[in-house]
A protein has these predicted regions:
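Bacterial Sec-dependent N-terminal signal peptides
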Residues: 1-23
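Active-site neighborhoods and metal-handling regions in enzymes and metal-associated proteins
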Residues: 21-489
Length: 489
């Protein structure tokens, strides 16, 4: 027994000394100086005598003792670069003085190093790593948050987001996210559970502000820096390559899940850490479901279209690109008419896209083109008919979220999508020749001083270019797997 304890102690000491920042991590993440400058930009936009508080995302459970892969809260990542759970960040408008005389204007509390835990669930950087790697001067373990003295009552405004209701309580851990939140609530006299809604919906009679932070962060995150644009370009290019490789490889009889797998293999091949959102791969009438993520159709029909809406997430930044292609490599006359109408609508919105324009105007432009075209095709009777076949807006910001924060009026260096679509479900009140046709074309754009730059042009958009690309050979055509069940003789 003594020998086992000694061995375990040596193992733990080894983990303590060697773990922290992984030597295998890429070195092209946003720099600590970049994140520090973002915190300063937020500070400059805050009111005098105010403080902003951010909590790391919760760890979310998949089932039983298996959790989902952790994904940091985008605001928290934007301001810190910290990618671990169980942390809280405080940013002060004005300098504060600690009991020991230290002057500071920001402070972060993070997950404490624990060698045994790291052996099971991965490296942590701890308070010292947060100082050395992320550039914080004031960084402490989460266990110190409860007793750290911040006189919240003196602030004119305490900015924070209201809390999610799915934060788990680990009763054996007094430094988990649940505990940090409860300790914060006690510090700021947060209303009891039955009164919590009044904090957000009524003019507060205290100094708690649950509304103001969103607008401040939207102002920052909506306009991308040079470094962010570089990461977005890479995420977009990776996603475009996925679309191109599917165009080359697709054959009738493939499954939706197989097509999804080709896209996501390309993402991983280029070191994209994650998907920006669940992949949408809808063959035929499944494309009429706007956010179809089942992707379980076992065999794609020779004569149908497939709508593919996917985005790689690279170093936190996500693309959002949709292409609709014919499974057999050739658009039918009806498919071509709908596709070219949607493309015409997108190009009209592209021309209208420039600084000073509201995002909603891009939808108006696309809708006018689509409605006129649907009347000409006899699919609807009047241009003012209810939007049965084009039920969504065409534009949103992209960045750390696929539907990123940002203000509605366009400015240079904003990154947005333009994504008109037409969806005609089976049994619609129109000629059956149109049934099951679903087309969406979605591209990513960078707003410039004069207009916009198409970021996702590597993936073909026109009928001619798509059909030409689908004639190209694919390396995946040689990739054959054995049958799981031998064919019966």
């Amino acid at each position: 027994m003594k020998h086992k304890l000694i061995t375990l102690s040596i193992l733990i000491l080894t983990f303590c000394s060697s773990f922290g920042q992984s030597p295998d991590l890429p070195n092209d993440f946003l720099s600590k100086e970049w994140h520090k400058e973002r915190r300063q930009k937020l500070r400059e936009s805050m009111l005098a005598n105010s403080v902003a508080i951010f909590f790391a995302n919760a760890v979310r459970n998949r089932s039983n003792d298996v959790d989902y892969v952790y994904h940091q809260d985008p605001d928290f990542f934007y301001l810190t670069g910290y990618r671990e759970p169980e942390a809280v960040l405080l940013i002060f408008k004005d300098n504060q003085t600690a009991a020991n005389g230290t002057v500071y204007n920001e402070i972060i509390f993070v997950q404490e190093r624990n060698a045994l835990r790291e052996m099971w669930t991965g490296r942590r950087i701890g308070a010292e790593g947060t100082k050395n790697l992320l550039g914080f001067e004031q960084a402490f373990n989460g266990s110190q948050f409860k007793k750290y003295n911040v006189e919240f009552s003196k602030f004119s405004e305490i900015l924070f987001y209201d809390f999610q209701n799915d934060v788990r309580d680990n009763p054996r851990d007094s430094t988990d996210l649940y505990s940090l939140i409860e300790q914060f609530k006690e510090k700021v006299n947060y209303p009891k559970k039955d009164n919590s809604l009044s904090v957000a919906k009524e003019q507060p009679k205290n100094n708690l502000n649950l509304r103001g932070l969103h607008s401040l962060m939207a102002g920052l995150r909506g306009v991308k820096t040079t470094e962010e644009i570089e990461l977005l370009r890479k995420a977009v290019m990776i996603s475009c390559v996925g679309q191109v490789e599917v165009m080359k490889a697709i054959e009738p009889g493939m499954s939706e899940r197989e097509i999804q797998g080709i896209h996501e293999y390309v993402f991983k091949k280029y070191q994209a850490e994650d998907l920006g959102y669940p992949s949408i791969v809808g063959g035929g009438h499944n494309g009429c479901i706007l956010h179809y993520t089942d992707n379980y159709k076992p065999s794609l029909d020779n004569k149908e279209l497939i709508l593919m809406d996917l985005g790689a997430e690279f170093h936190g930044y996500t693309a959002d690109i949709t292409r609709t292609i014919p499974v057999n490599g050739k658009f039918s006359p009806e498919q071509k008419q709908i596709y070219e109408l949607v493309l015409l609508a997108q190009e009209a919105s592209m021309k209208a896209c420039k600084p000073g324009v509201e995002l909603s105007h891009l939808t108006v432009v696309s809708r006018e083109v689509v409605n006129k075209g649907l009347v000409e095709l006899g699919i609807i009777q009047t241009e003012t008919e209810k939007h049965l076949f084009f039920p969504h807006g065409v534009s949103h910001h992209i960045g750390l979220d696929v539907h990123d924060k940002g203000h509605r009026v366009l400015e240079p260096n904003m990154a947005i999508t333009i994504e008109p679509g037409v969806y005609i479900p089976n049994n619609s009140a129109t000629d059956p020749k149109w049934w099951g046709i679903a087309v969406r074309i979605e591209d990513d754009f960078l707003i410039t001083k004069e207009g916009c730059e198409l970021l996702s042009g590597y993936a073909p958009r026109t009928v001619a270019d798509i059909e030409a690309m689908m004639k190209q050979p694919s390396p995946l055509q040689k990739f054959k797997l054995p049958e799981l069940e031998p064919k019966k003789k």
